[in-house]
Amino acid sequence: MHPESYSLAEVLAVADIHPFYNSEVQYPPQPDAIQHARESATKTATEVNLHTRPMVTKKDLYKVIKRLTHDTSPGNVYRLNSYISITGGGSGGLPLMFATDVKENRRHRSVFGDFMAACRLVDPGDWVLTTHASGYLYRSLDLTTELFENAGATVLSCGNYMTPAEVFQYLAHYHVNVLTGDGSQIIQLIHHISMLPVEQGQRLKLTKIIYTSEPLTQAQREHIIKTLGPIKIFSILGSAESGPYAIGSPDLTGQQECTSTVNFVFDTRTMLIEIFPSSIMEEPSPLSARPVPNGEPGIIVQTSLQRLRNPVVRYNTGDIGSVHALPERARDIIAQEDWEHLRVLRLHGRDRRFSFKWFAVYFEFENVATLMQAEGTGILQWQVILDTLKSSPQTTLEVRILRAIDREGLQSKEALVKKIRLFFNLLPENEHLFQITFVDDIGGFEKSGTGTKVMKFVDRTH
């Protein structure tokens, strides 16, 4: 496997003239400027030092992205020939967007498809059914369809609007052996299958589950195995900013006893990952911070070698993880020429001080607070609760609100509910997992251990 990618020197050279990283630059560079930067980087013999570069956060990036997205001047090439990925809702409720060059995006999909095949996530003859989302600006369906096709599979691109009963019929009728979707969609379908008569469930020939976007809990994994039998569970890791970049495979890293972490394999020829102490989340300018040794957990910082026109350099993801060597067991699968380039990223999850995840989307607490505290809402106190359904291990989201009595200038209750539902990206397939509860007094909220403080976020899933 010889993945196409840019050199670190090329990526840093373009970053120097890009407004993501240079506040004196108004617009991203034109194609000729990018080409000149690449040629200069290739000719320069000086050592490339990533450690002298400042880190950027999501807030840093999207402050610039917001300006570029709304600037329709002819000189703003950010809006030209771009593939748009969306990420968690902004404070106004509409999704944030990251633009990638269209040709870069296609090449990235091809390279990652080869990586999936090299890691045996996909085998010759696999038939894959995907239930990923499309529409409402989501591109998950076309992304995963192309990735699996590039990896050598035959794909049934079913999407998220088919009912579980319809998906089941397609799985059975076409002898599909691989099911892929967001974690929430997978669990929704597995729950449907678990309710069917045994003889109907036996029509399925599934050998693999490949989930994306959100980790499966231990209860969810057990539910899958109890329903489908001894099936392999794989995963794909990616983001709007970096695209897909790692795969989770028990064949490579072994079955995990601890489900509070998930092991992923990534290729250092396409993605550089540094791990920093958690203290960088609280430092205004963590330039002096140094990466922790391999094996120690900390904040994941990414530099993509597949993003050039809009580079991703030392991006603080807010995720917690650690980097490890591949275990020896992986030699049976990984080619010798690739071995030295692959690493294990052990993902511990999101830094829960700053965000939470529901139905494959991250929500920043800062943005939730801005929504709840906006003028005219009349919200005196609020709380977000993650839980699971009693009938299945699907994750639910409840928003509890204590509101001032109706007065002049307040939004109507209906308008407020509509605004909150828009913020949390409600779709037909997750509406039944969402609830807004208006409480009469402070007693309607979950309290801290001392019983005096209302907790803004309660997670009953862990």
Task: Pin down the residues of each PLM region.
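Nucleotide 5′-phosphate-binding alpha/beta core
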Residues: 1-118, 123, 396-400, 406-462
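Active-site glycine/GP-rich loop and adjacent strand/helix microenvironment
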Residues: 2-17, 160-462
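Active-site phosphate/ATP/adenylate-binding loop shared across adenylate-forming ligases
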Residues: 51, 56-208, 212-227, 234, ...
